[in-house]
Amino acid sequence: MSELAMRSVVIIGAGPVGCALATLLRRQGLAVDLFERQTESAGTGSGHSFNLTLTSRGLDCLPLSVRRRLYLQGSVLAKRIIHHRDGAISTQAYGTLYNHHLLSIPRGILQDLLRDQALRAGARIHYGQECIDVDTARASALLQDRDGSSTWVSGDLLVGCDGANSAVRDAIVAAHPADMRMTRDTIAHGYAEITMDYGDADPTGMHLWPRGDHFLQAQPNRDQTFTTSLFKPTAGDDAQRHFSGLPSASAISRYCATEFPDVFGRMAEVGNELASRSPGYLRIINTAPYHHRRAVLVGDAAHAVVPFYGQGINCSFEDAATLASLLEKFQAAVRSEGGTVKTVAEVVVDEYSDVRVKAGHALAELSMRNLEELSDHVNSPLFLERKALERRLHELRPDLYTPLYQLVAFTHMPYDAVQRVQQESSAVLDSLCEGRDVRAEQDAIIGEFAELYRGTTQLTPSKVQTG
């Protein structure tokens, strides 16, 4: 093996993110082997059927050929469609430009496309291989097959891309607790999947039924079906507002008929469906740092977030693109200035971790904050007035202000920078709006905001480099 060039990468986990990373690394001429715990026939599902929502932040990290194929099989959603308690329906656009939309796609379709792309690029996928230990100094993983036989595999770099229940991460934390810290928190809300007939639904938006601390969400698919999920607390004092307070099929049916009367007729089996299985739990996993020696974590293995921003997969693809970019940069430097494979691997993962840990932690906080918006705020007239003000401010002064959702979903500004910018601008708008009729005084508030920033330039997406 040449000491001046990295030649091989071992990836544990052959899900969408692992396959995307493999394709990027193969473009650099690296030998890439992916080892997947599941058998090939079982696939690499995550255990739930949420559609994955891709935005330009994540899509831009994928090859153009993959993006084209995804658009042929996914659903373009340009707005929220809000179903209010009184039967009224309102819409909220996700952004202001043609590419300000979500691409909603079933996980299985995304998985198949990215796996095929990785194989065409020359990556090798080995199924039925469970990671049971790692050696970060040697970039090695101990794998066990279905017969119980085990063997070590090694590369110049070891990547843990094996999801929220990452064996790579857990092995590193167990062996080096002082060097890698991990927290795992289960939030109060859980989820349950519901079968709901499509009917005459608008296929161009994400359908939401916000009901305080609980809400129903339905994502249209191209085959005129819905991927539908109910989110609500798992337990609490008010029985009707929590999963634990719905002990029978009849109680569930009464709840849905009361809360979602406009679509209850499309939920023929909702009572039996929810009574026959427990709700799923939602967890937040934060890790710091994302690396140890010559091993590095990518995607949910490093940072599992709740699905309320739909940014988990986008953040994970950014991880992959960032790691691949840093590898390319440092390999070029080594070839021109000298160094070793070990130097490249350890420098790359250190810089990657420095950038991506801050972004991952910020997204976890932003995702929890968006739960309040989805379940309650979208119903509030005051919230809608504020959103209208922010949208108008952006239209008039895009150099000074961009709404939070657009920064999160449709730019490459790091999530932690988004958080800082939004906290500053929100504080200013809060002070300007206090005690005023926001709708009637919209123009005056915008003028005062612009005056405060006269002669300055607020941090905007074009001025911040992505990690």
Annotate each language-model stretch with its function.
Residues 2-8, 55-193, 443-452, 459, ...:
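Conserved N-terminal helical subregion
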Residues 38, 164, 301-302:
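Conserved Walker B
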Residues 9-11, 32, 295:
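Conserved hydrophobic helix-helix packing surfaces used for dimerization/oligomerization
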Residues 116, 132-133, 138-282, 286-287, ...:
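Conserved FAD-binding catalytic core of PHBH/FMO-like flavoproteins
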Residues 14-27, 159-160, 194, 276-369, ...:
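Conserved mid-domain beta->alpha element of the FAD-binding
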Residues 17, 40, 165:
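Conserved Rossmann-like nucleotide-cofactor binding loop
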Residues 26-47:
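Glycine-rich FAD pyrophosphate-binding loop
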Residues 5, 325-467:
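C-terminal helical "tail/cap" subdomain of flavin- and related membrane-associated enzymes
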